[in-house]
Amino acid sequence: MNTATGVIALLVLATVIGCIEAEDTRADLQGGEAAEKVFRRSPTCIPSGQPCPYNENCCSQSCTFKENENGNTVKRCD
């Protein structure tokens, strides 16, 4: 077996193994167990003093406009 044939055989083997492993984590469009594994949300929140795009992401659940070091007004978590 020459080098080119060996490389092709390894690529085919890697593709087959990849397809078998991907079978375990494919998205379940019905909202079953696979969907819960793939689409998991982190329970982290934005600490106080950090910029906040939305109030619900702040640990304090509160976001107000404050002046930053440049003199601009930005929303920050309380």
Curated annotation (Swiss-Prot):
GO biological process: defense response
Main location per the UniProt record: secreted
Domain of life: Eukaryota
Annotated tissue distribution: Expressed by the venom gland.
Keyword Transport among record annotations: no
Disulfide bond annotation, renumbered to this chain: 45-59, 52-63, 58-77
Annotated site residues (Critical for insecticidal activity) in this chain: 51, 68, 76
Family matches, as InterPro entries: Omega-atracotox, Omega-atracotox_CS
UniProt key word Ribonucleoprotein: no
Family that this chain belongs to: Belongs to the neurotoxin 08 (Shiva) family. 01 (omega toxin) subfamily.
Role according to the record: Insecticidal toxin that reversibly and voltage-independently blocks both mid-low- (M-LVA) and high-voltage-activated (HVA) calcium channels (Cav) in cockroach DUM neurons. Also causes a modest block of insect sodium channel currents (Nav). Induces potent excitatory symptoms, followed by flaccid paralysis leading to death in house crickets.
Annotated domain remarks: The presence of a 'disulfide through disulfide knot' structurally defines this protein as a knottin.
Miscellaneous: This toxin comes from a male specimen. It is observed that propeptide sequences coming from male specimen are identical but have only limited homology with the female paralogs, but the reason is unknown.
Identification of the protein by name: Omega-hexatoxin-Ar1d
Species this chain originates from: Atrax robustus (Sydney funnel-web spider)
